[in-house]
């Protein structure tokens, strides 16, 4: 989406540093519930993905960003079940020289190319059940208004000036590079040619007069912000990386290009000879979505959580907060950063023909299955590897066998012929192990299960707060295994409903297992929404009983009435998740060629 830029400044910087910083102020928030400030008067929260550049079709990295944001947003809604209080935006970044050139090469107007590729992202996100409340396109009129107003704020505060920049420019990446980011590699003729150290694309020496943002004035305010809030950027290694970057001087930053060179973008207000640089234009999308420049945006900002890939960290953790401070606003509440996906140990690349088509994967592994795989296997702190066999093994083991098998066992007509939530017998399973009497049949492992599932919602919430969704799913999977062990240990299929000795314990075993399943279904809603809906519907859990506030696990065990005891189960919903290895004939590489 965004590309790193840096220049050697030749123009005058002008205004005094002290006078520029006097107006900057900070509001700090602690690591309370995800996306919610300590001082907020309501539960309003705003989640964003990056906006995706329309120079190529979507791949699984794009989908992964969207799924992380979707899961965080859905989990927040479980905590505060009000869609009106939660915003979630995604979209496409549609300006810039690469779009201008790609459209010309394809014989299309830039707007036609943007329409075509943006539609692909929108279709993918619909198919993947991404619950965004807004899809922003930077070619929209509302965005142009927001960007030009933001520009005016920076200019009115003395933070923009015209100057001559000279430096290496990479046309493919649409960015300027410092000398340290340029290397030499043999070209087609064998001569050493300058290329970008990060992308390998050719660079050329360029000199150009542009508008310049006084980024150099913001090094100390940014350090103050990050040192005052250790969780502002999560995971911690990325927070540390940004602080390391800030140990070096920040050069002022080009924020426009000559319109004769770049016409596909938003003009600088009052100067049609310049076009606002695409990366500044793109960042302002986060404000556009919440109504900027109208006053309504203040009810959302800065209560905002950005979910981004590590390749655009500098834009979101240095340039964007500095621009916001310059415009008189606070930095976002949280910046959640994730790493990338490789394919069979290699970086995804068109030249290697190994770019994974996410729509093929959604079709092959089901929407819920592929969502679960990416969020279960993706670890934000480091790159993760994809291959088809790994998907099949994980989904068959955890969704088809463990979770689906558990639901099938506990609702099967042979074991639960009445089709109800059976009664819990407190004498069979007393609340304290020491209270076990002649009728008590619960074992130490059973109490460990109850304890694990009772604490699971808090554990999962903590993992979400720490941007460790994979750990949340690992914790759920562990409890599913424990519950299967509980059922296997007590073998309800060997007990007899007609026996006055067996019946109370048989009902209790099923009641405990169904209560565990209800917790699992509730906690899986952010990750596998359709599967979780089928599971909860099979248990007879209504739509108003699916928030975290309504969970109340195993009330009867704690001496309270249960609204589920004696309730009829919901209608049969079929196999919860079909095994994938039973249809291996279709297991081919889901890659574009």
From Swiss-Prot:
Reactions it catalyzes: tRNA(Met) + L-methionine + ATP = L-methionyl-tRNA(Met) + AMP + diphosphate
Root EC class: ligase
Any Pfam family: tRNA-synt_1g
Annotated binding of ATP, by residue: 350
Subcellular location, record wording: Mitochondrion matrix
Motif segment ('HIGH' region): 52-62
Stated family: Belongs to the class-I aminoacyl-tRNA synthetase family.
Protein name per Swiss-Prot or TrEMBL: Methionine--tRNA ligase, mitochondrial
Organism: Bos taurus (Bovine)
